[in-house]
Amino acid sequence: MKKKLKKKYLLSALVCVAVVTGIIYYYFFEGFSTKDKTEYVCIDSNDNIDSVYSKLSPFASKHGMCAFRTLARHMQYADKIRTGRYAITPGDGAFSVFRHMRNGQQAPVSLTIPSVRTMDKLAGEISKRLLMDSTTLYRALTDEATCQKLGYDTATIACLFIPNTYDVYWN
């Protein structure tokens, strides 16, 4: 009689563990995104945790967003928000999306440098695709001290920018 009772408790405990494991798997590892194509989220330097949530919510499923909020709360993500452009691919779970954003594992941007004649147009084209102000970039490219650090002068710094497509990070 005691062995039967022991078996019954053991079996019910195993069923409970299996159910809890299934719920945790669904909650954290099932698809975060409701879209069937890769979406990108850009986190700026002035974003806080609420703005990150609002940027993620158009792509996230209800349980995915809830899981992301849980992970962010327990791992103090609000204190460690990293800027960047992050890819949310179909099939990624909330844990995977959270880990990429917390560790700063960005998706690269394809930066196409066009053939332009002036530095101000070059700075304008580059700043459209990256987290960079065109006036700041223009000042850096026309600053004599910055150019000398790189071994160029203001007349030859344009030679660094060969028209082509490059994979770079957003920030």
Feature-to-residue mapping (PLM):
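Conserved catalytic or metal-liganding residues and their short signature motifs at active sites
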Residues: M1-N171
